[in-house]
């Protein structure tokens, strides 16, 4: 009954989001059922986000997805092999700017009990090195696949995008700071990209989570307007310290 209620709420949230903006993976195809074993639905009563399982007890997502009590669903693809967990603890950078959702947009969720690896559930590795400019990386999510007349596929969709130099994102938005702990990624001609409905989801390069979907333009997947992804490599020490029990650690400035 809990799962049915959550899935009904997810549909309502998706329809609500679709009326406000294009919150979706644009230009993708249905993910292979075996390629998103780490993908999580991060659900609250008022929001829908995505997350990434990084070990049996921890999920990585975006800090701006912290909007109340969180329920995490894993193994979701046509409702096969689903495991449901409640967020036991949530960790956000203590030095994050409270008035800026884009600042240090990363959150660790500790589950109330470990998940079991299965055919459709397994963690994704943290990055060993940062991605290179020009790398082809993978995004995925459950959002609509068309816009503005939305169509919901009912399964996660995936798309390949490119890592750009940060200056490409600054060219689209000159007000951005000179440096950033984010990755700039997308397709220069537009047509593929993630958006708000995929917030917290992974940017995957060479089998590792390199980015977390953070923010983008008001209209998604527009030409010369790449998306912004929290650069996970810069936060690996913080992540590993939290998991090890050092909850007083701060994030890099």
Swiss-Prot record:
<feature type="disulfide bond">
    <location>
        <begin position="31"/>
        <end position="158"/>
    </location>
</feature>
<comment type="subunit">
    <text>Monomer.</text>
</comment>
<feature type="active site" description="Charge relay system">
    <location>
        <position position="64"/>
    </location>
</feature>
<keyword id="KW-1199">Hemostasis impairing toxin</keyword>
<feature type="active site" description="Charge relay system">
    <location>
        <position position="105"/>
    </location>
</feature>
<comment type="function">
    <text>Snake venom serine protease that may act in the hemostasis system of the prey.</text>
</comment>
<protein>
    <recommendedName>
        <fullName>Snake venom serine proteinase 14</fullName>
        <ecNumber>3.4.21.-</ecNumber>
    </recommendedName>
</protein>
<feature type="disulfide bond">
    <location>
        <begin position="169"/>
        <end position="184"/>
    </location>
</feature>
<dbReference type="GO" id="GO:0030141">
    <property type="term" value="C:secretory granule"/>
</dbReference>
<feature type="propeptide">
    <location>
        <begin position="19"/>
        <end position="24"/>
    </location>
</feature>
<feature type="glycosylation site" description="N-linked (GlcNAc...) asparagine">
    <location>
        <position position="149"/>
    </location>
</feature>
<dbReference type="InterPro" id="IPR001314">
    <property type="entry name" value="Peptidase_S1A"/>
</dbReference>
<feature type="disulfide bond">
    <location>
        <begin position="137"/>
        <end position="205"/>
    </location>
</feature>
<dbReference type="InterPro" id="IPR043504">
    <property type="entry name" value="Peptidase_S1_PA_chymotrypsin"/>
</dbReference>
<keyword id="KW-0800">Toxin</keyword>
<dbReference type="Pfam" id="PF00089">
    <property type="entry name" value="Trypsin"/>
</dbReference>
<keyword id="KW-0865">Zymogen</keyword>
<feature type="domain" description="Peptidase S1">
    <location>
        <begin position="25"/>
        <end position="244"/>
    </location>
</feature>
<dbReference type="InterPro" id="IPR033116">
    <property type="entry name" value="TRYPSIN_SER"/>
</dbReference>
<dbReference type="GO" id="GO:0006508">
    <property type="term" value="P:proteolysis"/>
</dbReference>
<keyword id="KW-0732">Signal</keyword>
<comment type="similarity">
    <text>Belongs to the peptidase S1 family. Snake venom subfamily.</text>
</comment>
<dbReference type="InterPro" id="IPR018114">
    <property type="entry name" value="TRYPSIN_HIS"/>
</dbReference>
<keyword id="KW-0325">Glycoprotein</keyword>
<keyword id="KW-0964">Secreted</keyword>
<feature type="active site" description="Charge relay system">
    <location>
        <position position="199"/>
    </location>
</feature>
<dbReference type="GO" id="GO:0090729">
    <property type="term" value="F:toxin activity"/>
</dbReference>
<dbReference type="InterPro" id="IPR009003">
    <property type="entry name" value="Peptidase_S1_PA"/>
</dbReference>
<feature type="glycosylation site" description="N-linked (GlcNAc...) asparagine">
    <location>
        <position position="117"/>
    </location>
</feature>
<feature type="disulfide bond">
    <location>
        <begin position="49"/>
        <end position="65"/>
    </location>
</feature>
<feature type="glycosylation site" description="N-linked (GlcNAc...) asparagine">
    <location>
        <position position="116"/>
    </location>
</feature>
<dbReference type="GO" id="GO:0005576">
    <property type="term" value="C:extracellular region"/>
</dbReference>
<keyword id="KW-0720">Serine protease</keyword>
<dbReference type="GO" id="GO:0004252">
    <property type="term" value="F:serine-type endopeptidase activity"/>
</dbReference>
<feature type="disulfide bond">
    <location>
        <begin position="195"/>
        <end position="220"/>
    </location>
</feature>
<feature type="disulfide bond">
    <location>
        <begin position="93"/>
        <end position="251"/>
    </location>
</feature>
<keyword id="KW-0645">Protease</keyword>
<keyword id="KW-1015">Disulfide bond</keyword>
<dbReference type="InterPro" id="IPR001254">
    <property type="entry name" value="Trypsin_dom"/>
</dbReference>
<feature type="signal peptide">
    <location>
        <begin position="1"/>
        <end position="18"/>
    </location>
</feature>
<keyword id="KW-0378">Hydrolase</keyword>
């Amino acid at each position: 009954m809990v799962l049915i209620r959550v899935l009904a709420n997810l549909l309502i949230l998706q329809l609500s989001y679709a009326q406000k903006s294009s919150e979706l993976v644009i230009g993708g195809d249905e993910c292979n059922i075996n390629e998103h074993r780490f993908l999580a639905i991060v659900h609250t009563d008022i929001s829908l986000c995505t997350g990434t399982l990084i070990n049996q007890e921890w999920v990585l997502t975006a800090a701006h997805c912290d909007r109340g009590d969180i329920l995490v669903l894993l193994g979701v693809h046509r409702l096969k092999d689903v495991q449901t967990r409640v967020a036991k603890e949530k960790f956000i950078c203590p030095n994050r700017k409270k008035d800026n959702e884009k600042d240090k947009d990363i959150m660790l969720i500790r589950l109330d009990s470990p998940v079991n690896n299965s055919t459709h559930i397994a963690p994704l590795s943290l990055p060993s090195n940062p991605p290179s400019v020009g790398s082809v990386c993978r995004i995925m999510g459950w959002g609509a696949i068309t816009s503005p007349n939305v169509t919901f596929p009912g399964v996660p969709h995936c798309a390949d995008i490119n890592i750009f130099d940060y200056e490409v994102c600054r060219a689209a938005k000159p007000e951005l700071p000179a440096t950033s702990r984010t990755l700039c990624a997308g397709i220069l001609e537009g047509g593929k990209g993630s958006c708000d409905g995929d917030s917290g989801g992974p940017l995957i390069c060479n089998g590792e989570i390199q980015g977390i979907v953070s923010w983008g333009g008001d209209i998604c997947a527009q030409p010369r307007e790449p998306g912004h992804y929290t650069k996970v490599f810069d936060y690996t020490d913080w992540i590993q310290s939290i998991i090890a029990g050092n909850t007083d650690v701060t994030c890099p400035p």
